[in-house]
């Protein structure tokens, strides 16, 4: 062990009394330590770096967003609350529009037909007719409805309301056909050997014309 106040400059062969003067000039190897040197005094003020005071480097600024700018933009809490409310209103209006379109496409056209009728292929069809054709042959019913839908409306109205001159023409034609049909029936009932009354009248008329006297000169 090293003793206090000893130096390596001394030699073991010399007297310790002669070494006292040399020991006074030499520096001791180990000196007593002060307790105040072991623990430094605590500072009165502690500086803490915050986010605003801390400066990020260029690569760090690209990774992290500008939080301070976002805070300045949303400084008012009311504006931040208005954004979700506006989105909810827009979503509700879009949903309401979709519901109205579905209502128009599915149920609204059905109300245009009167009671007891059903809308099929944009035509009001009676429910009894619908049930009848459905029980018989559904495919035939569909083809009939398709043909009715393809038929022009002008032709439909023409067949439903015939003109007055058509009725008069049919009546005159039936009157002309009536006497000829009656004569043919009478000729069929008479015997083949007996001449008809019409033939007798024509023969008498010819005989009277030939027997008439010539006019006086």
UniProtKB/Swiss-Prot annotation:
Keyword terms: Cell membrane, Cytoplasmic vesicle, Endocytosis, Glycoprotein, Membrane, Transmembrane, Transmembrane helix
A GO term, aspect molecular function: clathrin light chain binding
Membrane topology, as annotated: Single-pass membrane protein
Extracellular side: 1-87
Residues covered by region (Disordered): 1-25, 162-217
Transmembrane region(s): 88-108
GO terms for biological process, alphabetical: clathrin coat assembly; endosomal transport; positive regulation of endocytosis; postsynaptic neurotransmitter receptor internalization
Signal peptide: none
Superkingdom: Eukaryota
Residue numbers on the Cytoplasmic membrane side: 109-217
Compartments (UniProt record): Cytoplasmic vesicle membrane; Cell membrane
One Pfam family from the record: Calcyon
Xref: InterPro entries: NSG (IPR009431)
Keyword Glycoprotein: yes
Tissue specificity of this protein: Expressed in the pyramidal cells of the prefrontal cortex, in hypothalamus and in caudate nucleus. No expression in spleen. Up-regulated in the prefrontal cortex of schizophrenic patients with nearly twice the levels of non-schizophrenics.
Subunit structure, interactors included: Interacts with CLTA.
Family the UniProt entry places it in: Belongs to the NSG family.
Function: Interacts with clathrin light chain A and stimulates clathrin self-assembly and clathrin-mediated endocytosis.
Protein name: Neuron-specific vesicular protein calcyon
